[in-house]
Amino acid sequence: MRETATFTVPSGFDRYQNPIDPTVYKVSCVHLQADNSTHKTAQNTEVTLRGVLFVDGRYSIPQLDYEALQEAAQAAGGVISCTVTGRRGSTIGPFDVVVVDGLPDDEANLHHWELGLV
């Protein structure tokens, strides 16, 4: 988990569909894994993911509530955008976050987030 992810959460859009005053979060200690699987979103649509981003519940900094961020982005009429910077400085993306899953540990605490990216 040595990559860094930059998330952009829109608060609204102008008439040209450019984000207005987006909030940007930079999260360290994440891991991007390539993927080519089909998943159902919260809106019950099927999407083919390009990757899954793993965000640790303990070591990734800062700790964010990705479900709340996704709800805020959807309320603004958009989705969370994400780019990932690798250990050597290479940037991958941009991706759109379409699936947000918080997975618990054995004691029902948050273990990690899995973010499905397209």
What is each PLM-predicted segment?
Residues M1-K26:
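Active-site-proximal polar cores
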Residues N18-V118:
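Short, conserved turn/kink motifs that form compact alpha/beta structural patches or helix kinks used as
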